[in-house]
Design a protein with these regions (language model features):
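N-terminal secretory signal peptides that target proteins for export/translocation
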Residues: 1-29
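Bacterial N-terminal signal peptides
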Residues: 30-45
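Active-site mouth of glycoside hydrolases
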Residues: 51-269, 273, 280-284
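Short, solvent-exposed loop/turn elements at domain surfaces
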Residues: 77-84, 322-323, 385-390
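Substrate-binding cleft of secreted/luminal carbohydrate-active enzymes
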Residues: 292-368
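Acidic/polar, compositionally biased interaction segments
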Residues: 370-517
């Protein structure tokens, strides 16, 4: 979304109860910058020594090298928006898709929160945030949390009710159910909600104020120019600094004086969004916190452009029910009538395979990709493994696709139909010790599993059922596996797992990249 930059000479009233001594100064560029009392004292020589706490720095004075960031917006593919992501938090799908992200080279995730979910279930939200951070850290992934957002739709009035049902995505409409946070009712009654907004921010920050699993805080995504937004941004800036957190904060700003959003005066460091080409010429102390639309960019192009300049965060990791695979112009007035052959945003489908293997190669690099633990996958447009639609890779076989148009197929962009398709995976596993192993297939339809060319599992009928069988394997020696799945109708579901001596039951993962063997 595009907004008009701050205008020279424009001013606004400071909110009541601001905790810092503040003044507004004009830069030569005509931008308004917030300067804290700490900065004024420092400038006058009244504070000795280095200032390492972000709260003691002037806006945009925090310096870090962000070139390490290879990130992505993280909304699990089963959710229509960021509110549902937390309202119906699912540890299993979060863990699964964080695992995908780590295998594919993502080391930081941008995660949106929502004020209404804090109001609805504060204790559960705080618990789920800790669970998420634990899972992300398990995969060596840093997290940044976004508190507020001015983009897209207003929340439904009954979103706070315990039995609220999130609406289905609107086919052909970009980001069809994404929600602003907070909603207009809160913004228009700011004085009434201010203490609760403060508690929302500080309860989360206080629980993690020195948490090394968090890369930075983001008060506001793509803030517009309204007085309500600026007031909330300044308050949130102060509320976070009041906690004494050692983690820096930002709000979406810009990389050029005449382009972007209004977050710079309320940021410890500059972050901006780049959705048009490859234009950055700045330093690594600014971070591109969103980028990548395939009308003018590619993942390999972004990796190449930013690799020696600064870090980047892709919108987005998953290709799922939030509908960001459709383009900005495909809206409620002009929805796209058919499936897009090229996702506008997103990297990875719900079953774990990327839209383009080249995206993964770019993020990992050729050497790391060649060693990545990935199955080779073939998708067919028929149920007989005859009409090949696509070859790809996947870290595991663990999915429930549902029956919605577009996401009920493992890859609608490649022309795989939601019914009467087939998929084949090949790879190698490593039994840790000699002994008896059990293989499991939890499936809605027909599936075969071969180990070292021997048929071990053979589910011949439709209908959801788990089958299993024991097999003896030598320890420390790779075993070749092949899985063939045929789907007719209904919800495509397949979970392949195994267990054995020294191996608790777990989803089966390969030991090498079968696509390059």
């Amino acid at each position: 979304m595009n907004h008009t930059p701050i205008r020279t000479g424009e001013s606004f009233a400071l909110p009541p109860g601001s905790s810092k001594f503040t003044r507004l100064f004009w830069l030569a560029t005509g931008r308004t910058v917030l300067v804290t009392g700490a900065f004024l004292l420092s400038a006058l020589g009244m504070i000795a020594g280095p200032l390492t706490n972000p709260a003691a720095l002037a806006p945009l004075s925090y310096k870090a090298d962000w070139r390490w960031v290879k990130g992505a917006v993280f909304v699990p593919t089963k959710y229509v928006n960021e509110a549902q992501q937390w309202d119906e938090y699912d540890p299993v799908i979060n863990d699964r898709e964080l695992h995908y992200a780590s295998i594919y080279g993502i080391n930081c995730v941008r995660v949106y929160l929502h004020f209404d979910i804090y109001l609805k279930k504060k204790n559960a939200l705080l618990k789920d945030i800790e669970d998420f951070l634990t899972r992300a850290d398990k995969y060596s992934i840093k997290t940044e949390f976004v508190f507020f957002d001015d983009c897209w739709n207003q929340p439904d009035k009954d979103i706070l009710s315990a039995d609220y049902k999130y609406p289905a995505p609107i086919f052909g409409v970009h980001n069809s159910r994404w929600l602003v946070s907070p909603g207009e009712n809160v913004r228009q009654h700011y004085a009434e909600y201010r203490d609760r907004l403060k508690a929302y921010v500080q309860d989360i920050v206080n629980a993690h104020k020195d948490d090394k699993r968090i890369a930075f805080w983001e008060t506001y995504n793509e803030p517009n120019q309204s007085p309500e937004t600026r007031q909330l941004m300044e308050d949130a800036y102060d509320w976070i600094h009041e906690t004494g957190t050692t983690i820096p904060l930002t709000a979406t700003g810009h990389d050029l004086p005449d382009k972007g959003f209004s977050g710079d005066p309320y940021s410890d460091f500059n972050s901006w969004h780049e959705y048009s080409g490859y234009n950055y010429t700045g330093k690594p102390d600014s971070l591109c916190s969103e980028c990548m639309n395939r009308s003018s960019q590619t993942v390999p192009g972004i990796v190449e452009h930013f690799k020696s300049k600064t870090g980047f965060i892709l919108w987005e990791f998953g290709i799922g029910r939030d509908n960001c695979r459709f383009a900005w112009g495909e809206n409620r007035k002009q929805p796209r009538p058919d499936e897009t052959p090229k996702p506008f945003h997103g990297m990875v489908y719900p079953d774990g395979h990327p839209w383009s293997v080249d995206d993964v190669k770019a993020l990992l690099g050729a050497e790391a990709f060649a060693k990545a633990p990935l199955f080779a996958v073939e998708y067919y447009k028929d149920s007989n493994f005859a009409e090949l639609a696509k070859k790809s890779v996947a870290p595991m076989i663990d999915f429930d696709l549902g029956t919605e148009r577009g996401t009920g197929s493992p890859d609608a962009s490649a022309g795989v139909p939601p019914e009467n398709f087939s998929v084949r995976w090949r790879g190698a596993i490593l039994p840790p010790t000699k002994g008896t192993y059990v293989f499991y297939a939890d499936s809605d339809n027909q599936v075969k599993l071969f180990v070292n060319a021997k048929l071990v599992l053979n589910k011949k009928t439709s209908g959801h059922e788990e089958i299993s069988k024991e097999i003896k394997l030598a320890g420390g020696q790779p075993a070749e596996v092949k899985i063939e799945y045929v789907h007719a109708t209904g919800n495509p579901t397949l979970h392949i797992s195994w267990s054995g001596p020294g191996l608790d039951r777990q989803i089966m993962t390969p030991i090498n990249n079968a696509s390059v063997q």
